[in-house]
């Protein structure tokens, strides 16, 4: 049996994986309190370990972590939660459990999971993208993770979307992740307020939206958008709120989603043009928005920007392992490499 742990930006999962049956036999899901930082998450793990391990013959541990990882299993940093810089995560878990412990970036782990157990089975190459709180990627060739000797690889979320993106914070993740979509809604809401005050509607303050050639909204659309935004607790805005409003046709919700899927499709097209994977598997909470809001516009954007001979939108498929993908990946990295 294998102790498996996922440490993300908003969730924490611990479970036990049975490699003889390739199934999770136990799983506990916890919410991450970001304000408590890394120490808060470590406290949660330590508190949960006794109940997770009780009565089970566990021999090793695998961890998928939301950030770049050193070869020795220590954390380089987290882009979501403070306090992780240079933390010896593998050594800490070994000390608490006595188990041989392996740590990988969560997207690399998820990519390996889909290749072994999910949508990438029997393929020689596969690229995995997670679109959740952040955006990450993992590349698998011949059943093996690529870049294991490097602190990061296939970090599609940290691509700069175009030559005019001069700020380090101006990334694919800043437009297309769950956090990024919410932030773009907030920025666009500020513009909506200005438009209502001045009666002048321009994209001067938000050039990324202007580059999409989105038609100027009517004053009725602007007013409905402003009313919707004011009805929310803005500090608790989620992609679920945005998706629900977009389905209702609210312009302020639909427009950032258009920016998100266009930007992400562009980024996936760049990766596909460079490495030509047989399949591109996409997971994470944002990918659950459905065909109309996510998959159809994403595939359209991918087809627009990818190199012609690789223009096959059917290459983009959803994850088969869903919310458990990183736990399956944590198990895979803890097992001996496959021949």
List the predicted regions and their residue ranges.
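A conserved active-site-flanking secondary-structure segment within enzyme catalytic domains
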Residues: 146-162
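A short acidic/small-residue loop/turn micro-motif
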Residues: 31-33, 83-84, 152-155
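A charged helix-plus-loop insertion that forms the helical arch/lid used to bind
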Residues: 74-85
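ATP-binding/phosphotransfer module of carbohydrate and carboxylate kinases, centering on a glycine-rich
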Residues: 1-60, 70-72, 91-99, 113-125, ...
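Short beta-strand segments
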Residues: 6, 62-66, 128-134, 138
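General beta-strand structural signal in soluble alpha/beta enzymes
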Residues: 101-105
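Adenylate-forming
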Residues: 110-116, 137-139, 158-160
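Conserved A3 ("GATE") glycine/threonine-rich loop of ANL adenylate-forming enzymes
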Residues: 10-11, 107-109, 133-136
């Amino acid at each position: 049996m294998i102790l498996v742990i996922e440490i993300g930006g908003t969730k924490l999962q611990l479970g036990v994986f049975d490699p003889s049956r390739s199934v999770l036999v136990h799983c506990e899901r916890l919410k991450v309190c970001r304000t408590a930082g890394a120490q808060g998450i470590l406290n949660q793990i330590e508190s949960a370990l006794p109940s997770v391990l009780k009565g089970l013959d566990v021999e090793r541990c695998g961890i998928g972590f939301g950030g770049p990882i050193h070869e020795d299993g220590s954390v380089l940093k987290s882009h979501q939660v403070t306090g992780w810089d240079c933390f010896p995560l593998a050594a800490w878990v070994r000390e608490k459990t006595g188990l041989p412990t392996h740590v990988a970036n969560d997207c690399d782990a998820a990519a390996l999971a889909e290749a072994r157990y999910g949508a990438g089975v029997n393929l020689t190459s596969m690229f995995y993208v997670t679109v959740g709180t952040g955006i990450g990627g993992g590349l698998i060739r011949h059943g093996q993770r690529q870049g294991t000797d490097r602190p990061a690889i296939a970090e599609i979320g940290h691509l700069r979307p175009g030559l005019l993106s001069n700020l380090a914070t101006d990334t694919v993740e800043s437009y297309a992740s769950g956090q990024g979509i919410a932030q773009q809604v907030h920025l666009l809401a500020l513009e909506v307020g200005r438009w209502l005050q001045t009666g002048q509607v321009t994209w001067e303050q938000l050039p990324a939206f202007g580059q999409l050639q989105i038609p100027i909204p009517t004053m009725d659309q602007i007013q409905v958008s402003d009313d919707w935004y004011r009805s929310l607790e803005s500090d608790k805005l989620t992609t679920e709120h945005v998706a629900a409003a977009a389905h209702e046709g609210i312009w302020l919700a639909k427009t950032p989603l258009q920016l998100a899927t266009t930007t992400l499709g562009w980024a996936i097209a760049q990766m596909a043009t460079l490495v030509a994977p047989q399949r591109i598997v996409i997971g994470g909470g944002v990918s659950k928005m459905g065909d109309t809001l996510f998959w159809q516009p994403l595939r359209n954007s991918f087809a627009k920007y990818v190199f012609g001979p690789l223009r096959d939108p059917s290459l983009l498929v959803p994850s088969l392992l869903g919310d458990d993908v990183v736990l399956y990946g944590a198990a895979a990295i803890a097992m001996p490499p496959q021949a």
